[in-house]
Amino acid sequence: AQLPPCVISKEAKRTNVTSWMERLWQTYYTGKASGARYVHAVQLEDQYRCHPGLIQFSNRWVYRDGGPIKGLLPLKTPDAVTEQRTYEGRMFDWTMKKDATTDDDILWPMAWLDVAHGTEDSQGHGYDNSSEADVVFDLVLRLIDIGYKATEIAVISPYLRQVNMIRVRLSRPGTKLVTILHDSLEVRVGSVDATQGLEFPCVIMSTVRTVHQALPFVKDLRRTNVSFTRAKAALFFIGHFEAICSRIHKSKDWEIRQASEAWHWLGHHLKTRQQVFGCTPHVIRSLVRSPEGGTQVDCD
């Protein structure tokens, strides 16, 4: 469920060349569907990166054919126990209900900060969104104020132009953030592809786009999965909630349709859990408890 190799050759793209790993898995699933066993596979089920609530999306949309991936809790290693205590009081509640028996009982340490007033900008290749970059700046500053270390925070985006814009915002001379950090590069800012294989206690994802259409990164379930699974303890989405999560795109391509349904599912569950907010103060308060009303609460 990671990102495939980049195909640069035009001829390879034209003939739909795929990697040997993709062909191997395709053979496995073809055999599984037909009852034949062309390839024998073993799926690893234990992971020690993400809080159980953060792995729910991947279990529902990515790993469902092979069985669910187990989350970090119950804690099994001394380091994990120490890490939980470290995050206590400045994270989402890391505990699950003692009588938790279903996925719905597992707390989701994530929130969506709705930047409905933002506007995407495209000049040449790529997109950026200055309103989202400003909100990212504010959120990073507030996270550091409540006790995060800069090295515990990563900001990711599907668009390189947005990555560059956020880097500029975080390193703007004379800002309070740079004064606190001394070195703004301590906060990792990168594309989804660049952060594959990495992990951070807190991840902020800027989605950039504000138009209601079939967006490239929304159509790519594997890239979405990589974005969602970089965080160990807290995941924040910064973006236009309705544009990203409100529609299921009709497509003859099953993978595109499934990816769109996955984002819609995520949005529905975040709204149901009152984890969609309209301003950064509400998001910061949600680190302790989710205020009743979610986006219905008046913003500061």
Feature names for model-found ranges:
Residues 1-84, 158-160:
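Conserved coupling/interface region of RecA-like P-loop/ASCE motor cores
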Residues 4-42, 214-300:
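Helicase C-terminal subdomain and adjacent C-terminal extension
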Residues 70-168:
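Conserved helicase/translocase motor-coupling segment
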Residues 18, 48-51, 55, 133, ...:
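Amphipathic alpha-helical transducer elements in NTP-driven molecular machines
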Residues 1-2, 110-118, 205-208, 239-240:
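Short loop/turn segments at strand-loop or loop-helix junctions that form parts
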Residues 3-5, 51-52, 64, 119-121, ...:
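Eukaryotic short linear interaction motifs
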